[in-house]
UniProtKB/Swiss-Prot annotation:
Post-translational modification, as annotated: Phosphorylated by HssS.
Organism for this UniProt entry: Staphylococcus aureus (strain MRSA252)
Gene3D superfamilies: 3.40.50.2300, 6.10.250.690, Winged helix-like DNA-binding domain superfamily/Winged helix DNA-binding domain
Name of the gene: hssR
SUPFAM superfamilies: CheY-like
Designated name of the protein: Heme response regulator HssR
Length: 224
């Protein structure tokens, strides 16, 4: 079941969204502030976050930035502020979508599912290659009795490569699949994610490795 974090300082909004999410078989974890949301994430995995902008303490822009950079969680901003400058700031903060109040909760649910589809590459939740098992539902890697949870983007990148062993993916193909057509950042972010994945695979003693194909891109090899 999808786990959705909802952050708003209005308890009526929290209850309204949570009740409708439950009817759509989406688990809702409601929090009244950015600080409380981050505390929850220390012990609870979520798949997506719906975040209000106007909150005391940590506002929605700050929370969105933290969720994207530290947890790699897709974010939808929900707010009464509909000025173009606010929308621009929201997308600069990293939000994946933006919904203004008042809103139709069914539209919010449609948008939640649409964002999740962009983040999910393969409907198969589990895959094994060599001694490594990848569980997409929990973003986990497992080798024997060792288990490791990855940030969403790292996991989806590895899952995509592992699903097609020996196939070479260019940086452009990876960005298009993992970050989307509208990504405007540096393509070298792919190299950073690959470096982290190599470190994680080495730590797990996985037989899977990510190889660099000079001048072309990256591919996965399984050394059994």
């Amino acid at each position: 079941m999808v786990q959705c974090l909802v952050v708003d300082d209005d308890p009526r909004i929290l209850n309204y969204i949570a009740s409708h999410l439950q009817t759509e078989h989406i688990d809702a974890f409601t929090q009244p502030s950015g600080e409380a949301a981050l505390k929850l994430l220390e012990k609870q995995r979520v798949d997506i976050a719906v975040v209000d902008i106007m909150m005391d303490g940590m506002d929605g822009f700050q929370l969105c930035n933290t969720l994207k950079n530290d947890y790699d969680i897709p974010v939808i901003m929900l707010t009464a502020r509909d000025a173009l400058s606010d929308k621009e700031r929201a997308f600069i903060s990293g939000t994946d979508d933006y919904v203004t109040k008042p809103f139709e909760v069914k539209e919010l649910i449609f948008r939640i599912r649409a964002v999740l589809r962009r983040y999910n590459i393969n409907s198969n939740s589990e895959m094994t290659i060599g001694n490594l098992t990848l569980n997409q539902s929990y973003l986990e890697l497992q080798v024997s009795n060792k288990t490791m949870t990855l940030p969403n983007k790292e996991f989806q990148l590895l899952f995509m490569l592992a699903a097609r062993p020996k196939q070479i993916f260019t940086r452009e193909q990876i960005i298009e699949k993992i970050w989307g057509y509208d990504y405007e950042g540096d393509e070298r972010t792919v190299d950073v994610h690959i470096k982290r994945l190599r470190q994680r695979l080495k730590k797990l003693n996985a037989t899977l490795t990510i190889e660099t194909v000079r001048g072309q891109g990256y591919k996965v090899e399984n050394h059994v």
